[in-house]
């Protein structure tokens, strides 16, 4: 299931990388664009890594606040 969700994202990222710089700043040859692909993918991977490193901490905070809310929860007696 995850693979199905990530494939469109991967296609969009590859299209963005292959698009290269804007035409006003465009390189005269396509070889320069192909040389930049590994660096662009590495930067993208590093950004993803940084984003996913924060997930455990955010989950821990969420679960802690949820547990605190459950501790303070009282069922009203009718």
Swiss-Prot record:
Its main location: secreted. Residues 1-26 form the signal peptide. Disulfide bonds: none annotated. The keyword Signal applies. InterPro entries: ApoC-I (IPR006781). Belongs to the apolipoprotein C1 family. This is Apolipoprotein C-I. It comes from Lynx pardinus. The lineage of its organism: Eukaryota, Metazoa, Chordata, Craniata, Vertebrata.
